[in-house]
Amino acid sequence: MGQGVIGMSGRTLLDKIWERHVVRREPGKPDLLYIDLHLVHEVTSPQAFEGLRMAGRRVRRPDLTIATMDHNVPTTDRSLPLTDEIAARQMAALERNCSEFGVRLFDLYSPFQGIVHVIGPELGLTQPGLTIVCGDSHTATHGAFGALAFGIGTSEVEHVLATQCLWQHKPKVMEIRVNGKLPPGTTAKDLILGIIGQIGTDGATGYVIEYTGEAIRSLSMEGRMTVCNMSIEAGARAGMIAPDETTFAYLKGRPHAPQGELWEAAVADWRTLASDPDAVYDRVVEFDAGQLAPVVSWGTNPGQVVPVTGRIPDPRDFADPAQRKAAEAALAYMDLEPGTPIQDIRIDRVFIGSCTNGRIEDLRAAAAVVKGRKVAPGVRAMVVPGSGQVKAQAEAEGLDQIFREAGFEWREAGCSMCLGMNPDILAPGERCASTSNRNFEGRQGKGGRTHLVSPAMAAAAAIAGHFVDVRELLAEGGAAR
């Protein structure tokens, strides 16, 4: 069980990983955990490295520390000088710090550069049973591999750099059991938005979520990463999925994955990580995937969602006063009226990318909708691959040409429009169909209005100029992934 007694049977995936990594334990205090992989980027690391420098400390395990540039990087012509002074300083600082402290860096011009939560898995750095941290909220992405992965603050980044350990209270464990099969035209993004819509943005506060069930097992690794990525949006500390044959097939042969006899030994060990049949969870939530339709967020948090076939809710229909007030504020910010059909909402911008949906399967799904069609007049649409490797693969498959011919902008890898921290931002009042993970006020730029959707739904909105049920377009040709 989530707070299980050491040595007892019935351990969860979290129990097993946690116990392997406890360096020190004292009654009434947090456990000291060993960290297997520390991922670093340009935004949350400068102060941490400076703290080491001032204290005369070194990075304890530079071999377990990997850095990349993602949050602030330009996604247009990288041969031009950086125009954002803050971004330029942060990237220069990361280069200097990695050089001084011996940390491997995938810089702006590396073929392996990309969003930290995309490159970790694709390089085989992310593996089952590991503890993984990063100074970023969406580190939970790596939990799709059966790892314990969570975001940390800048002071904790410094602590891990210096000691390779971290003090942590053990969270409770919530099982989210996803029954049934995803209907045609629905995706992992629709699934996780539906789950957050059901349990709320604070529904998993204090927990690590373990996702189980038929629908989860049927997902590809990229789909599982999408689900785990947004666990934090339900308030969870992390999201996890037990490793299985799908996990092993994805990892085999990747640059940093074990090879030869080490691979066989690793897989044998990884098979033991799954929660025991008699494991007891602190809370169990069931979700019916079979009833899911493509989902669109209407408000200013990821729990404010409805099916694409639905309408904007009326705040008066919320029994809880806090939810009613939040709905009123969200509708005012989003400039929407209760009762408006989702498919009547017109959009100005489309963003396909991010650590949630910037992988090759996401781009294939969007391209399947876009192929042979054109972006609607007045809509500006862009595709930003999650990494240089994803970009190269997409170009090898001709996906970039499909997007370009339809009128999309094809960009370099980076976080881009997921957050208003780089040149790719919304103007005040612009409305965007986005495959990212947060629709908070101003998240994509001051006054910008964000609707969270799957890559296929974003592509469909770009073509129509408003939200449409992607299943109707797919019926004419192509298939969602």
Curated annotation (Swiss-Prot):
Catalytic reaction(s) noted: (2R,3S)-3-isopropylmalate = (2S)-2-isopropylmalate
Top-level taxon of the source organism: Bacteria
Cofactor(s) the record lists: [4Fe-4S] cluster
Keywords in alphabetical order: 4Fe-4S, Amino-acid biosynthesis, Branched-chain amino acid biosynthesis, Iron, Iron-sulfur, Leucine biosynthesis, Lyase, Metal-binding
UniProt xrefs under CDD domains: IPMI
Positions that bind [4Fe-4S] cluster: C355, C415, C418
Enzyme class: lyase
Gene Ontology biological-process entries: L-leucine biosynthetic process
Family recorded in the similarity comment: Belongs to the aconitase/IPM isomerase family. LeuC type 1 subfamily.
The protein's name in its UniProt record: 3-isopropylmalate dehydratase large subunit
Species assigned in the record: Symbiobacterium thermophilum (strain DSM 24528 / JCM 14929 / IAM 14863 / T)
